[in-house]
């Protein structure tokens, strides 16, 4: 979906952006909520690059807008505020990528998953009387793909440990975080 000739704008909805590696494995990059500029994540791709970007709709509905890359570039060059926005977008995405890399390398598998769960709070968290419900179904495969964990079985084992410690509970296939303070140090 991420062609070189078009810019993809997510107007509304939630998508998962992933990279399909040469060997067919999927590496999850981010969840994105609209409005968002999805194509800027793959702006540096060339035709000879050995991986592709996949954009998968995660919400019940999502709407997109396609704009010619050439037209977008021309408008950005002419509009200083838009240029500043695009530059800030790149900086924020770079900071998020560096943060995620830090979480994965400094915390090990468990810590990477703890940080990921904590970060889901700001994206999809809804407080209730028991804790914070991650109001989206996130599979063990998705968590593995975001955290650099090789199998969903490893994710299952780590989540089981969190359930036994009363940090999380699964409610209608969604994660209910009972103790966000337990996860927070891994996300700082």
Language-model regions: role of each:
Residues 1-2, 21, 32-36:
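Conserved short histidine dyad/triad with adjacent acidic residue
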Residues 1-12:
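Regulatory nucleotide-sensing modules
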Residues 14, 36, 61-63, 142, ...:
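Structural motif
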Residues 17-24:
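Cytochrome P450 core scaffold surrounding the K-helix E-X-X-R motif
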Residues 28-91, 95:
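Cyclic-nucleotide recognition modules
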Residues 81-147:
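Polybasic "coupling" helices that flank or enter modular domains
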Residues 123-188:
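Phosphate-/nucleic-acid-contacting segments
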